[in-house]
A protein has these predicted regions:
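Membrane-embedded alpha-helical bundles that constitute the cytochrome b-like, heme-associated redox core
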Residues: 1-186
Length: 186
């Protein structure tokens, strides 16, 4: 498998970044839901710290993914589909990128406005990006939670669209992003 994208499929780096971000976002949800059930104490604070660290990792990977997309150029040839579906696919991908960036940024803002640092697995702390402010913290907390609901919805629609292409249209859309899978040989 090649690192770079080609007309036949996505390269190893694009696939790795895609699936790493997917797995980390799912882990984020599981960690924070579990943390909310814990009483205040070291376990809860450790879970929240891990949630923040993974969020910043997602932000970094998303920035690398976008940079790779811009630098790499070549991407798989588009699958023939009606214009409205092409527009919906492009809009959906753009929205996913936006949400994947906005989610950790609003989390970082939420943490900063609460006066809490955002660390990275205990190795270092990111700078505060906003002054401590209770009202701003409440606002960013609501935005962060609302954005996750939108992200989850768009991600499910994205997955359903890929499954539709695979099982109904029987095209290469899903196969070209699956790890360790290449296009069908014809």
């Amino acid at each position: 498998m090649h690192w770079r994208n080609s007309l036949q499929g996505y390269g190893a780096l694009a696939k790795f970044l895609h699936w790493a971000i997917v797995v980390l976002i799912i882990a984020q949800y599981v960690i924070i839901e579990a943390a909310e059930e814990l009483p205040d104490g070291p376990d809860k604070f450790a879970a929240i710290a891990n949630h923040k660290s993974i969020g910043m990792l997602v932000l970094g990977l998303a920035l690398v993914r976008i940079a790779w997309k811009l630098v790499n150029g070549g991407r798989p040839a588009p699958v023939p589909m009606p214009r409205v579906q092409r527009i919906a696919a492009a809009a959906g991908h753009g929205l996913l990128y936006l949400l994947i960036l906005a989610q950790p940024l609003t989390g970082w803002l939420m943490s900063s406005t609460a006066g809490y640092p955002t660390g990275f697995f205990g190795w270092f702390e990111f700078p505060m990006i906003a002054a401590e402010n209770h009202d701003a913290h409440e606002f960013y907390e609501e935005v962060h939670e609302a954005l996750f609901a939108v992200l989850a919805t768009v991600a499910v629609l994205h997955a359903l669209a890929a499954l539709y292409h695979h099982f109904v249209r029987k095209d290469e859309t899903l196969r070209r992003m699956l790890p360790f899978v290449g296009p069908r040989r014809t």
